[in-house]
Amino acid sequence: MPNKHMPRILVTGACGQIGSELTLTLRERYGDQNVVAAGHKTKPSPTLRDSGPFEFIDVTQRETAERVVREYEIDTIYHMAAILSAVGEKKPHLAWDVNLNGLYNILELARQYRLTQVFCPSSMAVFGPKTPRNDTPQETILQPTTMYGITRS
């Protein structure tokens, strides 16, 4: 049974490299039933699937994420879902749709349902290839050269 005093967390992109580790870590911290993993097409690993709730959603279709927010009484979202560079360069419209329209849908849900927190990570890809990788200055100008970098800026 979910604990009402703990955050109720949704992790989009939970089947990805970072999302899967984040989900498992959040489940350890907040309890398995308080963290809902969500993916689109990729089947979850047995560890991810068996350690707590899992839902298939499409962030470009707001109603699929909205159903999960309502059903699980979500108050925090970690929005990890994204189309990465390899696919994004071949399918730029898909990258735009998932990475920007998907983010918009998540932010609108957060506004509508008055969620406590939304985390939307960026990427080193937003800086472009000429930016120093270590100790990147705070005032560095963003010069992304990939669809992924552009849509994560």
Language-model-detected regions and their locations in the chain:
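Glycine-rich NAD(P)-binding loop of the Rossmann-fold in SDR/ketoreductase-type enzymes
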Residues: 60, 90, 94-105, 142, ...
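Rossmann-fold cofactor-recognition segment
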Residues: 49-61
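Conserved glycine-rich Rossmann-like NAD(P)H-binding loop of the short-chain dehydrogenase/reductase
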Residues: 30-43
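N-terminal Rossmann NAD(P)H-binding glycine-rich loop of SDR-like oxidoreductase domains
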Residues: 7-29
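NAD(P)H-binding glycine-rich loop region in Rossmannoid oxidoreductase-like domains
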Residues: 59-98
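A hydrophobic alpha-helix adjacent to the NAD(P)-binding/active-site core of NAD(P)-dependent oxidoreductases
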Residues: 54, 95-98, 110, 118
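Conserved Rossmann-fold NAD(P)-dependent oxidoreductase catalytic core, especially the SDR/UDP-sugar
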Residues: 104-147
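SDR active-site strand-loop-helix element
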Residues: 12, 38, 77-83, 118-124
